Amino acid sequence: EGPVGLADPDGPASAPLGAP
Protein backbone atom coordinates (compact mmCIF):
# COMPACT_ATOMS: atom_id res chain seq x y z
CA GLU A 1 0.00 0.00 0.00
CA GLY A 2 1.15 3.55 -0.63
CA PRO A 3 4.19 4.77 -2.57
CA VAL A 4 6.14 1.59 -1.85
CA GLY A 5 3.51 -0.41 -3.75
CA LEU A 6 2.70 -3.28 -1.42
CA ALA A 7 -0.07 -5.76 -2.08
CA ASP A 8 -2.91 -3.38 -1.17
CA PRO A 9 -4.68 -2.34 -4.40
CA ASP A 10 -6.19 0.63 -2.59
CA GLY A 11 -2.82 2.21 -1.88
CA PRO A 12 -2.27 5.60 -3.55
CA ALA A 13 0.47 4.28 -5.83
CA SER A 14 -0.21 0.52 -5.72
CA ALA A 15 -1.30 -1.61 -8.62
CA PRO A 16 -3.64 -4.56 -7.85
CA LEU A 17 -0.65 -6.92 -7.84
CA GLY A 18 1.40 -4.61 -5.67
CA ALA A 19 3.64 -3.14 -8.32
CA PRO A 20 6.09 -0.57 -6.97
From Swiss-Prot:
Key words of the record: Antimicrobial, Fungicide, Secreted
Annotated spans, Disordered: 1-20
Known function: The synthetic peptide inhibits growth of fungus P.capsici and partially that of V.dahliae, F.graminearum and F.omysporum.
UniProt record, GO biological process: defense response to fungus; defense response to Gram-negative bacterium; defense response to Gram-positive bacterium; killing of cells of another organism
Compartments, as annotated in UniProt: Secreted
GO cellular component: extracellular region
Organism (species): Xenorhabdus budapestensis
Keyword Isomerase: no
Protein name in the entry: Antimicrobial peptide EP-20
